[in-house]
């Protein structure tokens, strides 16, 4: 099943690259943030996978409007995979 998520993530990133390469130049620069929303989405999907990455990208697109000041808004770091960062209540092996 993990393989399917990788394929979906790569497909989403390929679609974003297509947009960035062929559609975005026709529209001109519109993003108020650095990195741009498409770069943010590609990084978020690569870092967190297609589900959480798409959610982060959708939240970012919701903030990209004329009434928001914009600015530098990087993708959050992935949480550490140590047992101390786990939110579960049970013991770890």
From Swiss-Prot:
Entry's localization field: Cell inner membrane
Record bears the keyword Membrane: yes
Domain of life: Bacteria
GO cellular component, one term: plasma membrane
Entry membrane topology: Peripheral membrane protein
Main location per the UniProt record: membrane
Key words, A-Z: Cell inner membrane, Cell membrane, Membrane
Compositionally biased spans, kind Low complexity: 74-85
Pfam families: YidD
Region Disordered: start-end pairs: 74-93
HAMAP family per UniProt: UPF0161_YidD
Functional note: Could be involved in insertion of integral membrane proteins into the membrane.
Family: Belongs to the UPF0161 family.
NCBIfam families per record: membrane protein insertion efficiency factor YidD
Protein name as annotated: Putative membrane protein insertion efficiency factor
Organism listed in the record: Xanthomonas campestris pv. campestris (strain B100)
